[in-house]
């Protein structure tokens, strides 16, 4: 657990409001130190499920727990006992569920919303605090970094205004979490669709777009779409080594 700076008290009868930020990606920690921990209050950063200990969190009495990017289930006891806020890359109720960025891009979506919502026992179904426009251009890692800075600005507004979240309206559309096998390139219909497929998987911790051919495994990253061609970095390994 990383202890952040202590900012201004925010007028809560002389006490420092306590906030916890959880994030499992390196850019989450970077934005926490660059931006979030400088906001008013006492701040702690958590990056592993072991640190998200119910007893430890309860002893902190946090006003909010913010989840920037989290790959594990949050204990129901923690969600029910504290105001937990997650940031989801869709205009909910559309796009609840897993792999939102990849599911949006593969559907041809170029602009979405970053939604701050209260976590409940039903995934991505809780009431909404804020929505902000989010551009989905660039590679996946660039988009995740962009979204994290946007989330930091939304956190600032939430702790300042303490808005009451409002229930989602409309019919829910559920996204299924993608698997590593689905990163295989299979007959894209156009050069643009191939470019989108490569870039949507190009982030640390994600299985990159690949093809297997003639005993070799080809992984693609850093794609750029030019007129009539794609230029990309390719990492080639022996297929036997990849499978082992």
PLM features: what roles do these ranges have?
Residues 1-244:
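One-carbon transfer enzymes
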